[in-house]
Amino acid sequence: MDLAVELKEGILLVDKPQGRTSFSLIRALTKLIGVKKIGHAGTLDPFATGVMVMLIGRKFTRLSDILLFEDKEYEAIAHLGTTTDSYDCDGKVVGRSKKIPSLEEVLSAAEYFQGEIQQLPPMFSAKKVQGKKLYEYARKGLSIERHHSTVQVHLQITKYEYPLLHFVVSCSKGTYIRSIAHELGTMLGCGAYLEQLRRLRSGRFSIDECIDGNLLDHPDFDISPYLRDAHGNSL
């Protein structure tokens, strides 16, 4: 293997900017370093920010299945009083409520999100049912039967000033934070959607270790000093 290519293999930790798709960062990295074998340990929705673990080269893309199963941690803001079809800020508003839950009601509802819970995936998600992604049905205005998944969550309310509810949650693979916001709104009787989302940690990798994702657009940017091995050590 050419030494220049070998040095471009490893794990790159990126802070995904708001408004960009996860795959736009993968394309930017591919163009920057000329290595086509690039994977990840979990995508983020366009409106979300935070840790993206990018896997460069065959040796590291093989780690994808392992890293995808590791726990993740997020900080989020739910917007109470409004419901959207996608459960997030990019969706169509489908309901409004004038009810203003008390702090006591909020804290009581949050107690449900401790430990093992059953969660229903959003219709606007990449979860596959009958060979198609749920969002493919949703975009056609179709609703299809979904099945609950068992996930592990630990949620902590950090701030509440209606209509914004701030919380931090650590969770297992396959947890939809959008669904947590939606479920909180349902339990409170006012509805809610996910206003903001930031991934703070993916497995052992934290936001403090990430580079700004926009740097990948700079043709002269050198990723070599930021590459890590599977244990998180610098290469």
Swiss-Prot record:
SUPFAM superfamilies attached to this UniProt entry: Pseudouridine synthase (SSF55120)
Disulfide bonds: none
Alphabetical list of CDD domains matching this protein: PseudoU_synth_EcTruB (cd02573)
Gene label: truB
Catalyzed reaction equations: uridine(55) in tRNA = pseudouridine(55) in tRNA
Enzyme Commission (EC) number: 5.4.99.25
Molecular function (Gene Ontology), one example: RNA binding
Key words of the record: Isomerase, tRNA processing
NCBIfam families to which the protein is assigned, alphabetical: TruB
Transmembrane segments: none
Keyword tRNA processing: yes
Protein's UniProt keywords contain Zinc-finger: no
A biological process from GO: tRNA pseudouridine synthesis
Pfam families: TruB_C_2, TruB_N
Coiled-coil region: none
Its job: Responsible for synthesis of pseudouridine from uracil-55 in the psi GC loop of transfer RNAs.
Catalytic residues identified in the record: D45
Organism of this sequence: Chlamydia pneumoniae (Chlamydophila pneumoniae)
Record-linked PANTHER family: PSEUDOURIDYLATE SYNTHASE TRUB1, TRNA-PSEUDOURIDINE SYNTHASE
Name of the protein described by the UniProt record: tRNA pseudouridine synthase B
Family per similarity comment: Belongs to the pseudouridine synthase TruB family. Type 1 subfamily.
